[in-house]
């Protein structure tokens, strides 16, 4: 069996130990009473896609993921899921990680092993205040060549917030509605940390200013700031930018607005509404 695709199975509360060594796709959605996934699902070497959509009672995943072939892992709407599994160093193929609307309070430092990650979605995680908990290069396997294992540790005043300097393949970072964005952006929003970032979603967050470092993101093309009610200042943006959405940023100052308007070109999509 290579594919399992099931919807709305309310009678299932646990995924038991299944012998499916050839499983490549596992799609489960709207399992309202699913609470636990057996450890064996963390060791399916041929699994490429794993989706757990809106499993609102899910609380327990395998403690460790060693899914060497996994490329897509999606957990949107798993609102009671508070602990994310540790990542094995051999999980280098994961390209897309969607953790929208989950219950995570923190994410482990082993995410640094996901060196092929291109898209990371953390939107609407209202409880997420610590990212890469315990992040310390000495905690990672020293024999591994991990580009993302260089760390930038912020001060303790930011709730032990830390960020890696090497999500070297990440092109899309989605943090909309997330409280972790309330730490000072300039402590982690640096081009060396995300050298190929093309899209940054910060809308509906409590940010006040965008750091000057944004101008050095030479690959950034899209910036979304809608409903950032506290946002007051946006510096000059990189020449690569093509889309800015700053609708309903009620306190954005006139200088920022004028600066953005001066950057507008024929290939520049721009939405702006600011307080007069």
Describe these PLM feature segments.
Residues 1-158, 164-184, 188-276:
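Predominantly recognizes leucine-rich repeat
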């Amino acid at each position: 069996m290579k594919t399992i695709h099931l919807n709305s199975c309310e009678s299932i509360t646990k995924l038991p130990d299944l012998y499916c060594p050839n499983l490549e796709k596992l799609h489960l959605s709207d399992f309202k009473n699913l609470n636990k996934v057996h450890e064996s699902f963390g060791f399916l070497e041929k699994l490429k896609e794993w989706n757990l959509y809106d499993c609102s009672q899910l609380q327990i995943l395998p403690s460790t993921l060693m899914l060497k072939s996994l490329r897509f892992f999606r957990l949107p709407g798993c609102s009671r899921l508070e602990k994310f599994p540790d990542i094995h160093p051999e999980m280098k193929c994961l390209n897309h990680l969607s953790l929208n609307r989950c219950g995570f309070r923190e994410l482990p430092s082993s995410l640094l092993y996901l060196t092929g990650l291109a898209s990371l979605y953390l939107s609407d995680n209202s409880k997420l205040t610590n990212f890469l908990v315990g992040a310390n290069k000495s905690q990672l396997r020293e024999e591994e060549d991990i580009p993302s294992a260089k760390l930038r540790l912020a001060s303790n005043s930011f709730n032990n917030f830390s960020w890696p300097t090497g999500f070297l393949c990440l092109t899309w970072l989605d943090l909309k509605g997330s409280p972790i964005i309330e730490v000072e952006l300039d402590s982690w929003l640096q081009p060396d940390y995300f050298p190929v970032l093309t899209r940054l979603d910060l809308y509906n967050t409590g940010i006040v200013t965008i750091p000057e470092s944004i101008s050095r993101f030479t690959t950034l093309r899209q910036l979304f700031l809608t409903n950032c009610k506290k946002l007051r200042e946006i510096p000059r943006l990189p020449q690569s930018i093509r889309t800015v959405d700053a609708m309903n940023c009620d306190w954005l100052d006139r200088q920022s607005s004028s600066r953005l308007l001066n950057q507008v070109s024929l290939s520049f999509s721009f939405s702006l509404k600011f307080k007069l």
